[in-house]
């Protein structure tokens, strides 16, 4: 029972004979929460059962609060993607794994074009609608092993393990088309607007390159994409 996730925290109340101390002690050692001795008093049984139920509910609330606190610390509240803090700590681990195994790792920085204009024209609520829908489209365009996060404002980062620059470029282009090809509903669906993105791509060189340098090269590629007219993907070689 304790070995199964779904029953691990279920309270266990044991009933023992008065002379069976060894079994009672063994039960407590393996996870029994409380016990009663025969003959059973129904009032005592009900009281002990209610106590264990209260303890279980309190422990469940504590676990939920801890889990919620952890999620809030690593998740962007608006989009539901990982936040910058989580990305920066996890990226180092992914880069170390890629370098030690001699495997490719690609990174892209995505920026929503003219996002300030969206806020100025349609309001900040519309801007939030765009960010949320953008996050949804990111999730549908990447794999489970990829790491997507909101980097800040209208910038997002996607880290793709086991992915070379050619494959990452195809993923980036597919994502760019999915954004530009379908309008975004804003202001509770009362209006639909066109949105485009610019993407900068870079890959880890597997020669001990700091991850900060990979991010910098992706950012330079993003700058080129925006400088060259936006709504495009630009990659930079390692």
List the predicted regions and their residue ranges.
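Short regulatory alpha-helical coupling segments
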Residues: 70-71, 84-104, 135-143, 161
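Conserved nucleotide-binding and Mg2+-coordinating catalytic segments in signaling enzymes
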Residues: 70-89, 110-124, 132
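C-terminal output helix
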Residues: 39-49, 167
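Short catalytic/binding micro-motifs of nucleotide second-messenger systems
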Residues: 97, 140-145, 177-190, 203, ...
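A short pre-motif secondary-structure segment
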Residues: 147-150
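Alpha4 helix (beta4-alpha4-beta5 surface) of REC/receiver domains from two-component response regulators
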Residues: 3, 8, 17-34, 145
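Catalytic-core segments of nucleotide cyclases and related cyclic-nucleotide turnover enzymes
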Residues: 165, 169, 204-238
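Alpha-helical scaffold within the catalytic cores of cyclic-nucleotide enzymes
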Residues: 135-136, 167-185, 217-219
């Amino acid at each position: 029972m304790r070995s199964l996730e779904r029953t691990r925290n279920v309270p266990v109340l044991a009933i023992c004979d008065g002379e069976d101390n060894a079994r009672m002690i063994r039960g407590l050692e393996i996870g029994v929460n409380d016990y009663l001795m025969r003959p059973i008093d129904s009032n005592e049984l009900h009281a002990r059962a209610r106590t264990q139920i209260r303890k279980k509910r309190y422990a469940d609330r504590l676990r939920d609060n801890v889990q919620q606190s952890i999620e809030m610390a690593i998740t962007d509240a608006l989009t539901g993607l990982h936040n910058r803090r989580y990305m920066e700590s996890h990226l180092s681990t992914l880069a170390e794994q890629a370098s030690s195994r001699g495997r490719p790792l690609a990174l892209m920085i995505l920026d929503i074009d003219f996002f300030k204009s969206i806020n100025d024209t349609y309001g900040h609520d519309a801007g939030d609608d765009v960010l949320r829908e953008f996050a949804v489209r990111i999730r549908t365009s990447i794999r489970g092993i990829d790491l997507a996060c909101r980097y800040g404002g209208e910038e997002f980062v996607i880290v793709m393990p086991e992915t070379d620059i050619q494959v990452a470029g195809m993923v980036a282009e597919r994502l760019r088309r999915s954004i530009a090809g379908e309008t975004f509903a804003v202001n509770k669906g009362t209006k639909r607007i066109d949105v485009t993105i610019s993407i900068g791509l870079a890959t880890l060189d597997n020669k001990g390159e700091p991850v900060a340098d990979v991010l910098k090269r992706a950012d330079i590629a993003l700058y080129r994409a925006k400088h060259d007219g936006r709504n495009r993907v630009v990659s930079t070689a390692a």
